[in-house]
Design a protein with these regions (language model features):
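ASCE RecA-like P-loop NTPase motor cores
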Residues: 1-315
Length: 315
């Protein structure tokens, strides 16, 4: 009944929420005899028939045909000091972890031309990390290489930040956009070509598990569809992570670096879309910041060579 923990006057809030996604898609299945659900980032596939209440005729995840390897996915699990990096609850505010994330950002801002997009699991976590980076002098270092812009819950402010970001990328100053994995930026804004040469996922974008709405949904999924809480949370987080990474690759002649910065991604990489797994060798799944930087530099050197017209035919 209280809005916050410190409030003394009861102020009840009534939430209406749809726990069953099958309700929304049911009219589509009733009206059409054949329905195709397709996307580059709807993996792992097994969860959708369960949650939406349908049986599949064909369920397939495909790899991607590329004339050259135009994106570089990698999992960074350690900082330069070999300490583990993660947004896990126990160590998320550990100064050593925050500094390692800061070093990762600095190194990638140094080597990446034009635009860098960084996704955090939540606004709260992003704000606490930014203030700690400010105290450590990390933002001052990043500022030398890129303009720093931050997404906020206010959509007008965010639109203005995006406009400034694009201008900075166009005029050669370069920019880094700090945003949230479930915010406006991650959902429908493309960072094609020079607007997104590197995307960094800082931490696994799990939902806030203390939310009453989420708890109700998890209980519903467990009782109705026999979907375990952890399975759903993991599926949901990896789907959002893949969606964030997919923002940088928007065409056959586009290229970009995709960084998953959390040791927990190591065990979850088989939940990424097949086309990402296809270009993620074992050697790139347990990297330190220094190793990741070296691999990224090599990749960008290869990408700087002009793409011959003949290689583009038939793709």
């Amino acid at each position: 009944p209280f809005e916050s923990e410190t409030a003394t006057v009861p102020n009840p809030i009534l939430h209406f929420t749809c726990l069953d996604a099958a309700i929304a898609i049911k009219p589509v299945f009733e009206r059409f005899s054949s329905v195709i659900i397709t996307s580059g980032t709807i993996s792992p596939l097994e969860m959708y028939p369960k949650m939406l209440g349908f049986t599949t005729v064909v369920q397939e995840s495909y790899t991607m045909t590329l004339a050259r390897k135009s994106f570089l996915p990698m999992i960074v699990t350690r900082g330069s000091d070999q300490g583990a990096i993660s947004s896990g609850f126990q160590i998320r505010n550990d100064p050593a972890v925050v500094r390692n994330y800061g070093n990762l950002l600095t190194e990638f801002c140094k080597l990446t031309p034009d635009g860098v997009v960084v996704f955090f699991p939540s606004y709260l976590y992003m704000e606490s990390i930014i203030s700690m980076w400010q105290g450590m002098g990390i933002l001052d270092t990043v500022w030398k290489y890129k303009l720093i812009l931050v997404e906020t819950p206010d959509s007008q402010e965010t639109s203005l930040a995006l406009e400034t970001y694009r201008t900075a990328c166009n005029n050669g100053r370069g920019a880094v956009l700090l945003c949230v994995a479930r915010g406006k930026v991650s959902e429908g804004i493309d960072f094609d070509h020079h607007y997104g040469r590197t995307v960094i996922n800082i931490g696994v974008p799990f939902q806030y598990t203390e939310s009453r709405i989420l708890k109700a949904r998890l209980e519903f999924l467990r009782e109705t569809y026999r979907i375990r809480e952890n399975d759903f949370l993991s599926f949901d987080a990896m789907r959002h992570a893949a969606q964030c990474l997919g923002r940088v690759l928007r065409g056959k002649d586009d290229y970009g670096i995709m960084v998953l910065a959390d040791r927990r991604f190591l065990k979850k990489r088989n939940q990424l879309p097949k086309w990402m797994q296809q270009y993620l060798p074992e050697s790139d799944t347990n990297l330190s910041v220094d190793q990741a930087t070296a691999i990224a530099k090599k990749f960008l050197r290869e990408m700087s060579v002009a793409f011959p017209k003949g290689m583009q035919d038939g793709i």
